[in-house]
Amino acid sequence: MLRIGSRCVRSVPKSSLRVSSTKIGKLFVRSVSDKPEEVFTKLSDENDPQRDAFFKYSWGTWLKNDKQEKEKRITKFSLEGLNSVIDDLYKQSIENAKRLSKSSIPPPAYLPNLTVSLPHNVKIENIGTVNPNEKIRIVSMASIHEGKHHRIYKIDTNAEKSFVLRIPYALDDENTLAYRLKSEVATMDFADLKLGLKVPKVYSFGVNALNPVRQPFILEEYIEGTLLMRSWTPLENDAEDGKSHKDKLNAVINPISKFQAKLAEVKFNAFGSLYFAKDYKTSEESAYEGETNEELKDRWRIGPSVERCLWRKKSTLNFDDRKQYLGPWDISSPLDIVKCTGLLEAENARARLGLVQAHASPEVVAEDILKDQIKTFDNLAKVAPDLINTKTTSIPKMENLLKPRLHHPDLDPMNVILKEDDDVPYLLDFEGSSIKPYILQNTPQFVAYDGPKIYDLEKDIEGYKDMEESEKAKLEFMYKRTRNQFLWEFALNENLPELISSVAPPIKVLRNPYVAAIERKSDEEYLLIEEALLQLAEVWPIFANNKLVNAAEYPLKYSEEEVKKHADALNAYHEKLISQPFAATQGWMPQDMFDNLVQGGILVKNEKGDYVISRTEDA
């Protein structure tokens, strides 16, 4: 989910492809060297077998079903088709120079080849030029990142201009990918033109495999620089001066907090996600009020939300059946977002259960887990209407917390690059962005912490000085996580003081079930949602007395047997996370670590072709 310069890639090998109009060349071979092994290929040879390795996933291995997981992440595309798209951009830039003023912002151009270009970005000053008799061509490519959801290539041309090509993995159905790409580009466009944020310029995109690239893609500006993550040291020890460690941490926190503040500036007319007007013709309503720039007035619309939880692994459901849960939602009904999230997940679990019971499921999942998921998500939907009293006066400036604001799901130092020449931060990868009330927007993952809070080790922990070093280390970890979150919330108060109530402890407890739902990564994590619902039940009477919720009694009833069953299941899940390496990442591990564990005999292949910990290692 980031785009980085080759110098910013962590110490892993990169694949590099040199393209020739005359030679057949080589493709990369994975190597421990930081220098890529070059491979040459002929541009017109679409069937060159040497290219195959260039498109295969190589940054990690799954302990189970590795072959199938990697096949889903093959990003084979047409080099010749990509070259034609880039060449056409240069032709467009010449025409744009003739017909557009420097400040002109025309609508996106929907082209016959089923790509879309953004004319205000496709300018000679942005993409360069070649000699009049010379045709633009790709001269080399490098794979610079293999992320969770897409792969990123750096494309170099004979115009001495580099581009970034982003290709999503085929993990979802075509409709999901199309909606996701349309919204992502429109959101980046909005962030650039309306908010003035530093983001990569998008030149062209295609939402399906019918375009010349033969893959959904985004072609955007390449920014040379250093990832902000390089400066993030979350376990930094407190300095003796009591200040310099905060300065170091805030050097990362503050730029991201300022991005968040800019994203929250505009109050929208509905909840959902942004699209270009032509990509969402269902609505004629402007995305927001008060626009004075005529070229921006009808540029964007609010359509179905592309928040990841609403689309991820939902292909079991018919797309038309899914759409009823995706919004857009009226500005007067913010809690419908929570309700629809629960209803959609419950319906998806029912559909999956039906396939399992009919012995037609392509996945291995226990019936009991799916049945419990259905119950949990139905519970979330049932609680939703009463979850927050939107008229309460107990929370200061509640009306501000309920207004529709842009939410970026990956505010993270891994998603920010400091430009090489001036260290200006650029925010990357807007995939999954949505518009929802700030009261439902969770703390960014890099600073989020929901464990025991320790603000001062010696004052808060009795006998801390006399403890064993191992016990001190655990408490110091909690302290540093608490400290980092506090620094984030302090920055929030500096940059968005009208929204500081969003991090009040009661608000966090109220939104915890929803946050657990949108952050769920595995089937068993429904237990975290149920745990949040049970915790909410304990404090509901207090919240009701203070008019924070809409019902005097908690909408859910739990028997002692149900509470015990849940506690046992949650404990078993936590034990699994401890006893099974990489359970939290669904069995995925970085490739260099996997190679070392196999070479050391710690991981061995079983009769099914999966990798397990060696029995001798257990002994």
UniProtKB/Swiss-Prot annotation:
Organism of this sequence: Kluyveromyces lactis (strain ATCC 8585 / CBS 2359 / DSM 70799 / NBRC 1267 / NRRL Y-1140 / WM37)
Task: Provide the organism lineage as a comma list.
Answer: Eukaryota, Fungi, Dikarya, Ascomycota, Saccharomycotina
- The UniProt gene name for this protein comes to AIM9
* Targeting presequence: 1-31
Which Gene Ontology cellular-component terms appear in the entry?
Answer: mitochondrion
Keywords, comma-separated and alphabetical: Mitochondrion, Transit peptide
Give the location in the cell: Mitochondrion
Primary localization? mitochondrion
What is this protein's name? Altered inheritance of mitochondria protein 9, mitochondrial
Q: What's the family?
A: Belongs to the AIM9 family.
Q: Does the keyword Mitochondrion apply?
A: yes
